[in-house]
Regions:
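N-terminal intrinsically disordered/low-complexity leader segments
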Residues: 1-27, 209-222
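Hydrophobic/aromatic-rich alpha-helical bundle segments in the mid-to-C-terminal region
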Residues: 2-3, 140-146, 160-222
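Short, structured helix-loop boundary elements
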Residues: 29-30, 50, 72, 76, ...
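Helix-turn-helix
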Residues: 31, 35-73, 77
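Hydrophobic alpha-helical connector segments
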Residues: 77, 91-118, 161, 167, ...
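Amphipathic alpha-helical packing segments from all-alpha helical-bundle domains
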Residues: 84-87, 93, 103-107, 136-161, ...
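Amphipathic alpha-helical segments used for helix-helix packing
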Residues: 104, 118-138
Length: 222
């Protein structure tokens, strides 16, 4: 997902002390969300402690617990906000591809490539969160699936408008290409993996939207 904002100046707050930024323009909730987003995306959830979060946000620990209840509560709020921002960006960006559905579908991986090229790209927070949590804990998986369903629903709608024989199946296949490209780009730091995914996606689109030829009727014989 796209990271929220450029890194802000880290402020030091005494543990358990009063929030020094109370009354400032940006709420403590927003500062904690911004700090959580930056730190979780770059360093990982498990590697980021509460002390680092409140130091980055310039708040007290008690403020974090009062607003979010726990670090896990902050993690879930960060994922919700990041998912919403990323989906808004992704959908609006591919919809700029042209008036018809096919140009929009063709823009999926060029758009994804611009995300990969961003120096703040650290992979997908949802994939990362599921990977870091207990595999028997369904909370992160449920949040990740909810995000994925919204993305695939939009792709499926475009696929249906493009005349795909199986819009849901096509959307699922493109979704797998997106996930694979994200992981490959995160590991290799090579945004060109999006180009290979684009070639595969165009092949899928061509196959799914190719008109079905009707069999010619046999010629009448005398």
């Amino acid at each position: 997902m796209r990271n929220s904002q450029d890194t802000m100046t880290i402020q030091s707050t005494p543990v358990g002390g009063q929030d020094p930024a109370q009354g400032s323009g940006e709420s403590a909730r927003d500062r904690l969300l911004d700090a959580g987003t930056r730190l979780f995306c770059r360093y990982g959830i498990n590697a980021t402690g509460v002390d680092a979060i409140v130091s980055e946000a310039g708040t007290a620990k008690t403020t974090l617990y009062k607003i979010f209840g726990s670090k896990e509560g902050l993690v879930e709020a960060v994922l919700e906000g990041e998912g919403r921002r990323w989906r808004d960006w992704f959908i609006s960006s591919i919809d700029e591809g042209g008036p018809g559905p096919r140009p929009k579908l063709d823009r999926i991986f060029p758009v994804i490539k611009t995300w990969f090229a961003d120096e703040r790209f650290y992979g997908c927070p949802f994939i990362n969160a599921v990977g870091e949590h207990d595999k028997n804990d369904d909370r992160m998986r449920t949040i990740a699936i909810g995000h994925k369903k919204i993305v695939l629903r939009h792709i499926e709608k475009l696929a249906d408008q493009a005349g795909a024989a199986d819009p849901a199946g096509l959307a699922h296949q493109i979704g797998l290409l997106i996930d694979g490209a994200i992981i490959a780009a995160m590991v290799t730091r090579d945004c060109a993996v999006a180009d290979a995914a684009e070639i595969a996606a165009r092949t899928l689109l061509d196959n799914h939207t190719r008109p079905v030829r009707k069999k010619a009727k046999p010629l009448m014989t005398a």
